[in-house]
């Protein structure tokens, strides 16, 4: 029997989704433990400094424990080159990322000597489905701060065309033209109802990120908007509207105004079925466990 420790290091919306899926779709001979010291396999979530992951892997190795790394971010970390992470990945039993890490290694001239699982994050179609609401918000966005997730650009563009933004956060003093859901991130049914009231959903995270709202919003009939980056196109090609990031606010705001001035492409049943298949948490989590055992 494999004893696995998969608990998140912090209360993070995205990591919690991964943890839930790993537990829900694990083989019957996996036992989950809440004490890291009792585990044969420890899942680590890499979203910040490399050294913390590296120190943990070294400590686990000294205790004859294996580590699996979920590479949540790379370009936005203080160690943004693949060479910085090679020793981490090579020591891990498995590395899972939405990034094509072997391809990035090859582009940077680095060897690929690690067990890799290339997979996206997922969506639960049981909860995320379209409801019959008026789409009174031009776009829904998850953003805690004015300068994060492109909230400033989104709100500026929406105000220019006289439309309202829905922010999936607690209320803040960001001025008119924004409404708030309050903290509902752990309530999938409520999230789905709000997504169903949005014409667009924002996937406008700068630098990197998988952007769960893209696929959750799509299942609820909201068309995603993403920056035109390879890490987004590889998963969302044909599903999202892409706008350039490189030109900054001077280019982003007019691109958003152009989209907000037109009705979004309707999300078809075929697209929803594609999302269900491509981003199925069951398939994704089972693939992880198969590679751990493989």
What label would you give each PLM region?
Residues 93-129:
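Donor nucleotide-sugar binding/catalytic pocket of nucleotide-sugar-dependent glycosyltransferases
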Residues 247-250, 261-293:
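A charged, aromatic-enriched C-terminal amphipathic alpha-helix characteristic of glycosyltransferases
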Residues 124-126, 132-180:
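Conserved catalytic-core segment of nucleotide-activated headgroup transferases in glycan assembly
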Residues 25-107:
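Extended catalytic core of nucleotide-activated donor transferases of GT-like folds
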Residues 89, 193-198:
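Short alpha-helical donor nucleotide-sugar binding micro-motif in glycosyltransferases
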Residues 206:
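Aromatic "clamp/platform" in nucleotide-sugar-dependent glycosyltransferases that forms part
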Residues 1-56, 225, 229, 245, ...:
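N-terminal pre-catalytic "stem/leader" segment of glycosyltransferase-like enzymes
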């Amino acid at each position: 029997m494999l004893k696995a420790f998969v608990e998140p290091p912090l209360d993070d919306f995205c990591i919690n989704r991964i943890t839930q899926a790993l537990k829900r779709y694990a083989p019957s001979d996996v036992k989950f433990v809440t004490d890291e010291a009792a585990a044969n396999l420890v899942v680590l979530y890499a979203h910040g400094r490399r050294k913390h992951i590296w120190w943990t892997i070294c400590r686990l190795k000294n205790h004859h424990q294996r580590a699996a790394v979920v590479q949540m971010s790379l370009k936005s970390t203080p160690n943004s080159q693949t060479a910085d992470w090679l020793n981490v990945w090579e020591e891990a039993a498995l590395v899972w990322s939405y990034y094509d890490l072997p391809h990035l290694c090859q582009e940077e001239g680095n060897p690929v000597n690690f067990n890799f699982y290339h997979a996206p994050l997922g969506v639960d179609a049981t909860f995320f489905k379209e409801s019959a609401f008026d789409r009174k918000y031009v776009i829904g966005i998850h953003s805690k701060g004015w300068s994060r997730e492109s909230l400033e650009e989104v709100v500026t563009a929406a105000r220019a065309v006289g439309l309202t933004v829905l922010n999936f956060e607690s209320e803040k003093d960001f001025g008119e033209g924004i409404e708030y859901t309050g903290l509902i991130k752990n309530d999938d049914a409520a999230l789905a109802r709000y997504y169903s009231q949005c014409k667009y959903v924002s996937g406008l995270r700068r630098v990197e990120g998988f952007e769960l709202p893209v696929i959750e919003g799509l299942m609820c009939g909201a068309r995603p908007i993403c920056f035109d980056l390879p890490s987004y196109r590889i998963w969302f090609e044909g599903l999202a509207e892409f706008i350039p990031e490189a030109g900054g606010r001077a280019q982003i705001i007019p691109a958003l105004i152009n989209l907000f001035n037109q009705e979004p492409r309707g999300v078809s049943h075929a697209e929803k079925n594609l999302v269900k298949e491509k981003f199925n948490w069951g398939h994704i989590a089972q693939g992880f466990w198969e590679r751990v055992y493989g």
